């Protein structure tokens, strides 16, 4: 036949229609073909869209002053630490956006953060609130549970698993999350001198954390626990995960004061020597002091930003009880209002709660348990007693375990009596 095809028809790109002879390469799929030119064009379109998204993310990212303002709504005091965190977090996420759009090859290094302050000063809460403001996945880990590979305890990769779980196993979201490692001071070296015994929960853990702090592709066991060769692993890039480590670092102030050649405040101070202000050691804290405390230089090098937190005063604790958006007093008022009961705390009660938290050396962390204990009997009774109108917590309820004052609604007339068990 005259019109019989004697040669195989030349393959054409399914997108632009160009035959194979006019392009360098054609990739075949299931009945579909794409040429190298269309691949390059598609890549450019995707890159441009990613660049536009990254620019939008940078514009939408709260500025340091905005972050600080939002932190002020939830966290009382600690202005210095909040400023340091606001700037550091802003620069961190701006850096991530820059990585997506910058073609100059200029690399901005990651800056992890160390929070140093006494127990109950708000270290964990600050990190939690930051993640909430930025709407990123967040995970908390306890450094004291970690051991280096090969020993009984948790692998450092399990920290990443917690973040992945909190991101609903969305790896991309997890890779832009925040991880807070508490009690980091507890994995300091036992002594400056090298020991012949293995420090599996101290320097060894610091060494194990180095890579994930700096940025690496970590293999995470999906079910947690120890890794074994036959197990399927999840790969997580830690390059853009912000790590915040925190600890009380008891005794670090003495290291700073000794370095400055100053004596401790109080009766031990000799005449003629410079007195040390309460916050002087915080202003003069250096990475060298942390090395002296027991953190290895390589570890400190990966946490260049240090923010110190002050010990909370009684006035601070009273403000924490009443002022933030989710203040404890507001929370318990809301709880009892669901049973149509008004809750009030007298000024004396608030003062007593704050004093008790300080005497227990728990700071803000101890407030909830004190308030919870004072309200236990009330919260037990009110759901079953429709006649209760108002509950007042006084100083004696906190300090002497007295009964709260309860106002009843009785035939539209109010009658106040002491609650009975």
From Swiss-Prot:
<comment type="subunit">
    <text>Component of the ClpX-ClpP complex. Forms a hexameric ring that, in the presence of ATP, binds to fourteen ClpP subunits assembled into a disk-like structure with a central cavity, resembling the structure of eukaryotic proteasomes.</text>
</comment>
<keyword id="KW-0862">Zinc</keyword>
<dbReference type="GO" id="GO:0051603">
    <property type="term" value="P:proteolysis involved in protein catabolic process"/>
</dbReference>
<dbReference type="InterPro" id="IPR050052">
    <property type="entry name" value="ATP-dep_Clp_protease_ClpX"/>
</dbReference>
<feature type="binding site">
    <location>
        <position position="38"/>
    </location>
    <ligand>
        <name>Zn(2+)</name>
    </ligand>
</feature>
<feature type="binding site">
    <location>
        <position position="16"/>
    </location>
    <ligand>
        <name>Zn(2+)</name>
    </ligand>
</feature>
<dbReference type="InterPro" id="IPR004487">
    <property type="entry name" value="Clp_protease_ATP-bd_su_ClpX"/>
</dbReference>
<feature type="binding site">
    <location>
        <begin position="118"/>
        <end position="125"/>
    </location>
    <ligand>
        <name>ATP</name>
    </ligand>
</feature>
<dbReference type="Pfam" id="PF10431">
    <property type="entry name" value="ClpB_D2-small"/>
</dbReference>
<dbReference type="Pfam" id="PF06689">
    <property type="entry name" value="zf-C4_ClpX"/>
</dbReference>
<keyword id="KW-0547">Nucleotide-binding</keyword>
<dbReference type="InterPro" id="IPR038366">
    <property type="entry name" value="Znf_CppX_C4_sf"/>
</dbReference>
<comment type="function">
    <text>ATP-dependent specificity component of the Clp protease. It directs the protease to specific substrates. Can perform chaperone functions in the absence of ClpP.</text>
</comment>
<dbReference type="InterPro" id="IPR019489">
    <property type="entry name" value="Clp_ATPase_C"/>
</dbReference>
<dbReference type="GO" id="GO:0046983">
    <property type="term" value="F:protein dimerization activity"/>
</dbReference>
<keyword id="KW-0143">Chaperone</keyword>
<dbReference type="InterPro" id="IPR046425">
    <property type="entry name" value="ClpX_bact"/>
</dbReference>
<protein>
    <recommendedName>
        <fullName>ATP-dependent Clp protease ATP-binding subunit ClpX</fullName>
    </recommendedName>
</protein>
<dbReference type="InterPro" id="IPR010603">
    <property type="entry name" value="Znf_CppX_C4"/>
</dbReference>
<dbReference type="InterPro" id="IPR027417">
    <property type="entry name" value="P-loop_NTPase"/>
</dbReference>
<dbReference type="GO" id="GO:0016887">
    <property type="term" value="F:ATP hydrolysis activity"/>
</dbReference>
<dbReference type="InterPro" id="IPR003959">
    <property type="entry name" value="ATPase_AAA_core"/>
</dbReference>
<feature type="domain" description="ClpX-type ZB">
    <location>
        <begin position="1"/>
        <end position="54"/>
    </location>
</feature>
<keyword id="KW-0067">ATP-binding</keyword>
<feature type="binding site">
    <location>
        <position position="13"/>
    </location>
    <ligand>
        <name>Zn(2+)</name>
    </ligand>
</feature>
<dbReference type="GO" id="GO:0140662">
    <property type="term" value="F:ATP-dependent protein folding chaperone"/>
</dbReference>
<feature type="binding site">
    <location>
        <position position="35"/>
    </location>
    <ligand>
        <name>Zn(2+)</name>
    </ligand>
</feature>
<dbReference type="GO" id="GO:0051082">
    <property type="term" value="F:unfolded protein binding"/>
</dbReference>
<dbReference type="GO" id="GO:0051301">
    <property type="term" value="P:cell division"/>
</dbReference>
<dbReference type="GO" id="GO:0005524">
    <property type="term" value="F:ATP binding"/>
</dbReference>
<dbReference type="InterPro" id="IPR003593">
    <property type="entry name" value="AAA+_ATPase"/>
</dbReference>
<dbReference type="Pfam" id="PF07724">
    <property type="entry name" value="AAA_2"/>
</dbReference>
<dbReference type="GO" id="GO:0009376">
    <property type="term" value="C:HslUV protease complex"/>
</dbReference>
<keyword id="KW-0479">Metal-binding</keyword>
<dbReference type="GO" id="GO:0008270">
    <property type="term" value="F:zinc ion binding"/>
</dbReference>
<comment type="similarity">
    <text>Belongs to the ClpX chaperone family.</text>
</comment>
């Amino acid at each position: 036949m005259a019109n019989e095809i004697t040669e195989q028809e030349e393959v054409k790109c399914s997108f632009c229609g160009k035959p194979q002879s006019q392009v360098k390469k054609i990739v075949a799929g299931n009945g579909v073909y794409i040429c190298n030119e269309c691949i390059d064009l598609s890549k450019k379109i995707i890159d441009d869209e990613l660049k536009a998204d990254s620019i939008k993310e940078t514009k939408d990212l709260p500025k340091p002053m905005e972050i600080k303002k939002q932190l002020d709504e939830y966290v009382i005091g600690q202005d210095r630490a909040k400023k340091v965190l606001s700037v550091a977090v802003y620069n961190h996420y701006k850096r991530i956006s820059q990585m997506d759009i910058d073609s100059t090859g200029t690399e901005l290094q990651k800056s992890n953060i160390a929070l140093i302050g006494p127990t109950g000063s708000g270290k964990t809460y600050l990190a939690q609130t930051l993640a909430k403001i930025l709407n990123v996945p967040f995970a908390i880990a306890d450094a004291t549970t970690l051991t280096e590979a090969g020993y009984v305890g948790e692998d450092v990769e399990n920290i990443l698993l917690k973040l992945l779980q909190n991101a609903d196993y969305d790896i991309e979201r997890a890779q832009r999350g925040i991880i807070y490692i508490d009690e980091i001071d507890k994995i300091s070296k036992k002594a400056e001198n090298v020991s012949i015994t293995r420090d599996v929960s101290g320097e060894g853990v610091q060494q194990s954390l180095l890579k994930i702090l700096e940025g690496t592709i970590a293999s995470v066991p999906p079910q947690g626990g120890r890794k074994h060769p036959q197990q399927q692993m999840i790969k997580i890039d830690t390059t853009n995960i912000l790590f915040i480590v925190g600890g009380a670092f008891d005794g670090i102030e003495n290291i700073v004061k000794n370095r400055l050649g100053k004596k401790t405040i109080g009766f031990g101070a000799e005449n003629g020597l410079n007195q040390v202000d309460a916050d002087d050691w915080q202003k003069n804290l250096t990475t060298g002091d942390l090395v002296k405390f027991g953190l290895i230089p390589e570890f400190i090098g990966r946490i260049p930003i240090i923010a110190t937190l002050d010990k909370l005063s009684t006035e601070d604790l009273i403000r924490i009880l009443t002022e933030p958006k989710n203040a404890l007093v507001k929370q318990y008022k809301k709880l009892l209002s669901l049973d149509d009961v008004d809750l009030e705390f007298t000024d004396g009660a608030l003062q007593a709660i704050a004093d008790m938290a300080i005497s227990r050396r728990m700071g803000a962390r101890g407030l909830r348990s004190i308030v919870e204990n004072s309200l236990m009997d009330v919260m037990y009774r009110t759901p079953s007693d429709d006649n209760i109108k108002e509950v007042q917590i006084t100083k004696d309820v906190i300090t002497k375990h007295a009964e709260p004052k309860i106002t009843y609604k009785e035939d539209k007339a109010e009658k106040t009596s002491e609650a009975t068990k």
